[in-house]
Curated annotation (Swiss-Prot), chain A:
Name of this chain's protein: ER lumen protein-retaining receptor 1-B
Swiss-Prot/TrEMBL site (Important for recycling of cargo proteins with the sequence motif K-D-E-L from the Golgi to the endoplasmic reticulum) positions: 193
Region (Important for recycling of cargo proteins with the sequence motif K-D-E-L from the Golgi to the endoplasmic reticulum): 204-207
A Gene Ontology cellular-component term: endoplasmic reticulum membrane
UniProt site (Interaction with the K-D-E-L motif on target proteins): 5, 117
Subcellular location: Golgi apparatus membrane; Cytoplasmic vesicle, COPI-coated vesicle membrane; Endoplasmic reticulum membrane; Endoplasmic reticulum-Golgi intermediate compartment membrane
Similarity comment text for this entry: Belongs to the ERD2 family.
Lumenal side of membrane: 1-4, 53-58, 111-116, 169-178
Chain's role: Receptor for the C-terminal sequence motif K-D-E-L that is present on endoplasmic reticulum resident proteins and that mediates their recycling from the Golgi back to the endoplasmic reticulum.
TM spans (from-to): 5-24, 33-52, 59-79, 93-110, 117-135, 150-168, 179-199
Cytoplasmic topological segments: 25-32, 80-92, 136-149, 200-212
Gene (UniProt): kdelr1-b
Length: 212, 10
C-alpha cells in the first residue's frame, strides 16, 4: 500500500458515499445516469468474484464489500425506490457499445485465459469507459448539479491517483500491470474535459454547464 | 513479463 493508492481508494469511497447521500437525502436521482451505475455494479461484481476465495487483508475485503453493496444500493435507488425521478430521456447512451467491445477485448488481451482472469480483465476495461453514459447525460442536459460534479471529480481523481500508485509500484516494487495501467490512462483521459470545467467553473462557485 | 500486480488492488 502507498499513499497514492490509499488516497485513491478514499477518493473512490467518498465519490460512492457522495452519490448515495445525494440520492437518499434529496430523494431524487435527477441528473444521474442509471446506466453508468449499472455498469459500475457489473464492474464490481466481475472484479470481486474472488472476494470469498482470496483473502488479501481486512481493508481489502471490507472495501470490496462496501463497493459492491453501495453500487447495488445505488442501482436499486435509481431503478426502484426513486425511479419516478430517474431522467431516462437524457440517459440514452447505448451501453451495449461499451459492454460488447470490452467483453471481446478481455478475451483477446488478458494475462491468463481463465474465467476469473478474463472477468477481472473485462471489469478493468469496462470501468475505463463506464462513466461515459454519465458524461454523455451531463453534456445532453447541458449542466450538472454541483453535488454531482463533486461526485464526478472524486470518481475521476481516484483512477488518476492510481496512475501515480502504479508509477510508485514500478519504481519501488518492480511491479506493473499493463492492462490496468492502459485502462487507467484511458479512464483518466475521459475525465480531462470535465476536470477542466470543474476546476475553472465549479471551484469558482459557478454551476457546471457544458456547451450542449 | 508484466506481473499481474493489480490483483491486490481494489
Amino acid at each position: 500500500m502507498n499513499i497514492f493508492r490509499f488516497l485513491g481508494d478514499i477518493s473512490h469511497l467518498s465519490a460512492i458515499i457522495i452519490l448515495l447521500l445525494k440520492i437518499w437525502k434529496s430523494r431524487s436521482c435527477a441528473g444521474i445516469s442509471g446506466k453508468s451505475q449499472l455498469l459500475f455494479a457489473i464492474v464490481f461484481t466481475t472484479r470481486y468474484l474472488d472476494l470469498f476465495t482470496n483473502f488479501i487483508s481486512f481493508y481489502n475485503t471490507s472495501m470490496k464489500v462496501v463497493y459492491v453493496a453501495s453500487s447495488y444500493a445505488t442501482v436499486w435507488m435509481i431503478y426502484s425506490k426513486f425511479k419516478a425521478t430517474y431522467d431516462g430521456n437524457h440517459d440514452t447512451f447505448r451501453v451495449e457499445f461499451l459492454i460488447v467491445p470490452t467483453a471481446i477485448l478481455s478475451f483477446l488481451v488478458n494475462h491468463d485465459f481463465t474465467p476469473l482472469e478474463i472477468l477481472w480483465t473485462f471489469s478493468i476495461y469496462l470501468e475505463s469507459v463506464a462513466i461515459l453514459p454519465q458524461l454523455f447525460m451531463v453534456s445532453k442536459t447541458g449542466e450538472a448539479e454541483t453535488i454531482t460534479s463533486h461526485y464526478l471529480f472524486a470518481l475521476g481523481i481516484y483512477r488518476t491517483l492510481y496512475l501515480f500508485n502504479w508509477i510508485w509500484r514500478y519504481q519501488f516494487e518492480e511491479f506493473f500491470d499493463l492492462i490496468a495501467i492502459v485502462a487507467g490512462l484511458v479512464q483518466t483521459v475521459l475525465y480531462c474535459d470535465f476536470f477542466y470545467l470543474y476546476i475553472t467553473k465549479v471551484l469558482k462557485g459557478k454551476k457546471l454547464s457544458l456547451p450542449a | 513479463e508484466a506481473n499481474t500486480a493489480a490483483k491486490d488492488e481494489l
